[in-house]
Design a protein with these regions (language model features):
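Transmembrane alpha-helix boundary and packing residues in multipass membrane permease domains
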Residues: 21, 25, 36-37, 73, ...
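Short alpha-helical transmembrane segments in multi-pass integral membrane proteins
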Residues: 1-21, 75-142, 188-245, 301-366, ...
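Short runs within selected transmembrane alpha-helices of multi-pass transporters and secretion channels
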Residues: 65-68, 137-155, 163-171, 196-212, ...
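Structural signal for membrane-spanning alpha-helices in multi-pass inner-membrane proteins
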Residues: 109, 152, 178, 182, ...
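Residue-level hotspots within pore-lining transmembrane alpha-helices
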Residues: 23, 27, 31, 60-64, ...
Length: 454
């Protein structure tokens, strides 16, 4: 990270951080994309099982990953103050937190998985596939969260190219392990859909080992000594949880509504489940663009606030949101004209492709609102503002969006489409509320004179 004084310099730095973030976000989303595509090509019933499993674990993964992501603004502001010792201490504490969260997630799954699946009244084979997938995936909980800590630390330093190369490595690892275990290649058992869970877990173990080597060898990471042993200091856990829990529950609230919609699709049959998952899965890939801009703005804004430069932070915010809207428009135009090709990636039957195309059409609307809402969430995290965005997320998705879907399902013949309309309503509301919150936060900084432009 470095100071900038002109718009051209800021745009250059924004893209210097953004492009690697975008590439590794695409690589990150590709893990579930690979699971979905490979499983769908194996058998439609296995795709339905993996889809249900994803609806169950995605909210918890994003909740815990959101808590860990609080490391980015914390380190970003410490970096702005040039506090290397503080950075080393807080990163190691986050590693303890990551392990603790992984153990908690495993225990929740152990206790609640069977009751949750039994309540859904799924076809027996779909339920079995979902259960086995999640049990095998749980082997990767600890490396997933520890890697998330390391990646967040690297990102906060502005070294997003390093994170990019690490995440790119995930793609061939995941493809190799998935292919081997789904189809039973290279002497390994043919596990079908559950093999994708084990393949992803194994890929993250390898990725964690590589990330630790990078921490020890990279010349810009070695000076921070983040792997130097530190005992747990519970007093240092206050800020990570004070900031991380609202961030985590904010993301959880958003992902949970999407997951709940996925679960509600169960009553419409396995083909609707599979088509819904296919459309949603590709939407997640498209979401990598605004999410990447969100992460880049968290890194930059937190650094500028640490430097006490509100004027520069505002300029980055303007550039970031404008970039997100332009990229989203171009992406959605391409998506609209390529719906048949995209649908064909996930399945082969004509009825499946036609239904998936309809779901993809609905996704175009909520992705446009995401292009504004996601960057604003990242900006607010850079300001260390997390509690109010969490409340606004609950209001937009659960108080406005979900009731709309339930009412439309009950009062009309829209069927599964009612819940896609609910997602659109929730994201539109969330977008508007977050815009108001950002304006309020910036106004407080300006009025109180807490941060001055240089």
């Amino acid at each position: 990270m470095y100071e900038t004084n002109h718009t051209s310099e800021r745009l250059k730095l924004l893209f210097k951080i953004l492009i690697p973030v975008l590439i590794y976000q695409l690589a990150n989303f590709s893990a579930q994309f690979i699971d979905t595509v490979m499983t769908g090509q194996y058998h439609e019933m296995h795709l339905a099982g993996v889809s249900i499993a994803g609806s169950l674990y995605n909210p918890f993964f994003t909740l815990l990953n959101g808590i860990v992501a609080a490391l980015i603004p914390i380190v970003g502001q410490l970096l702005g103050k040039n506090d290397k010792n503080g950075i080393q201490k807080i990163v190691f504490q986050f590693m303890y937190i990551g392990i603790l969260l992984a153990i908690i997630l495993f225990c929740i799954g152990l206790i609640g998985l069977n009751p949750a699946l039994n309540q859904m009244h799924l076809e027996a084979e779909v339920s079995t596939i979902a259960r086995e997938y999640l049990l095998l995936l749980s082997i990767g909980f600890i490396p997933f969260l520890l890697f998330s800590v390391i990646r967040s630390f690297i990102d906060a330093l502005g070294l997003t190219r390093v994170s990019m190369f690490l995440m790119i490595l995930l793609v061939p690892l995941n493809m190799f392990f998935n292919y081997s275990l789904i189809y039973g290649k290279f002497g390994l058992p043919e596990l079908g859909g559950p093999g994708a869970g084990l393949g992803t877990a194994m890929a993250y173990w390898v990725l964690l080992i590589v990330a630790i080597i990078v921490l020890k060898k990279h010349p810009k990471l070695k000076p921070y000594h983040v792997l130097s042993f530190e005992r747990p200091h519970l007093l240092l856990w206050k800020e990570p949880f004070a900031l991380g829990l609202p961030i985590g529950f904010n993301v959880f609230g958003e992902v949970a509504i999407f997951a709940l919609v996925g679960l509600l699709m169960a009553k419409f049959g396995s083909q609707v489940i599979a088509s819904h998952q296919a459309a949603m899965n590709f939407s997640y890939l498209a979401y990598a663009f605004p999410m990447s801009i969100s992460n880049a703005l968290t890194i930059i804004v937190s650094y500028e606030i640490g430097q006490k430069n509100q004027k520069s932070a505002k300029e980055y915010i303007r550039l970031g949101i404008s970039t997100s809207v332009i990229i989203a428009f171009l992406t959605l135009v391409w998506l609209y004209f390529n719906r048949p090709m995209i649908s064909g990636l996930y399945g082969t039957s004509e009825s499946f492709i036609q239904l998936t195309m309809v779901f993809l059409s609905y996704s175009l609307l909520f992705q446009m609102f995401d292009a504004i809402a996601a960057p604003i969430q990242g900006i607010l995290r850079g300001y260390k503002d997390a509690k109010m965005p969490f409340i606004l997320c609950l209001l937009g998705f659960w108080v406005i969006g979900l009731p709309v879907g339930i009412m439309l399902d009950w009062m009309t013949d829209l069927g599964p489409y009612a819940y896609w309309i609910a997602l659109i309503a929730g994201l539109m509301s969330n977008c508007f509320l977050l815009m108001l919150r950002l304006r309020s936060v910036q106004k407080k900084y300006d009025e109180r004179g807490l941060v001055y432009g240089k």
